[in-house]
Amino acid sequence: MELLTQTFWSIFTTDVFFYCILGVVAGMVIGTLPGLSATMGIAILTPLTFWLEPAQGMAVLLGIYNSAIWAGGISAILINTPVSPASIAQTFDGYYMVSQGKVKKALNMNTIYSVIGGLMGTVVLIVFSFPVARFALKFGPPEMFAMALFGLSMMIGVSGGYILKGLLAGALGLMVSTIGMDPMTGSLRFTFGNMNMMDGIEFVVVMVGMFGVGEVLFQISKRSEEDKKKRQQAQIASNTAEAFPAAKEFKGSVIPTAICGAISAVIGAVPGTGGDIAAIICWQQTKNFSKHPEEFGKGAVNGLAVTSCANNAVIGGAMTTMMTLGIPGDGVTAVLIGSLMMYGMQPGPMMF
């Protein structure tokens, strides 16, 4: 408890707090730009923190991490274009809320529930580090294979009534993921003699292309007088709509948010997972247990609440395995491990 108190007060020293704010601002810029991510931001800016003290440098990097995950939801909500995998599930309901003129409400919900999820993840990191880390350590190849099958089965759940389309989209995604060099045999797959295809296709490139370009083409196709009137009506509704969820809506989201925050923190502690898996699982399970599942995917308040909470609660879980076992929970913590080593710290049990 004494060490925890000392750490808490050290955060609010002038220099550490300043660098934390600096990292948050940098993360906001990085998180809202399609094609960038928290991983790329930390990897690019880490060399600029070498002249800082370890506490100051980690304040910058952790500020970027948390802020970029939150800011990723802004593009997902406003233009239906997730800039990182973690914000994919926020497009399910967030963009529909914007289409209904609830822009302020959607953005404020993203902020509120992201903070709630981040705090829940922090509690897990502080209180449950060792139990969660021991659980994650038990995950071997059979468990990872089972989780992969579970992830594939989620395609049917999130596709609604269009099961065939969901299966087809999943098959195309698996096909694209096999492009490049086979990591086991070294043989080339679907490169068609193009050496630039050896490294495969980056997930972010596919994601921005599928969501971003598709949304641009969709908006171009809607250019008509009738659609202009609808957009004007949506703008008027946006000016008059409530900026925050109603008390009844907030009360109804407490239990789903609490459950999904806890689940996401545990998922984040499992190596190889991330905010995208946690958010989609939480969205689907909340829909399954909802009294009004037909509202999900059409601007449901709980749909946006649990996804915003989930992709931020994952951070605490991912940091748990990184700090206690030295095993990165996701791509961002893999880069953070390298940063800690450069500061002279070795993540793992010896840190405790």
Describe the predicted segments one by one.
Residues 108-224, 340-352:
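Membrane-embedded alpha-helical modules
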Residues 55-59, 96-113, 290-303, 334:
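Membrane-interface alpha-helices at helix entry/exit sites of multi-pass transporters
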Residues 66-71, 112-124, 132, 176, ...:
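Membrane-embedded alpha-helical segments of transport systems
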Residues 1-57, 130, 134, 188-300:
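Helix-loop-helix hairpins and the membrane-proximal interhelical loops
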Residues 21, 25, 41-43, 62, ...:
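Hydrophobic alpha-helical segments embedded in the membrane of multi-pass proteins
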Residues 24-38, 68-80, 155-160, 261-271, ...:
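Transmembrane alpha-helix interface/packing and boundary motifs in multi-pass membrane proteins
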Residues 38-48, 61, 76-96, 126-127, ...:
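Re-entrant/interfacial helical elements at transmembrane boundaries that shape
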Residues 104, 108-117, 255, 259, ...:
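Alpha-helical transmembrane segments of multi-pass membrane proteins
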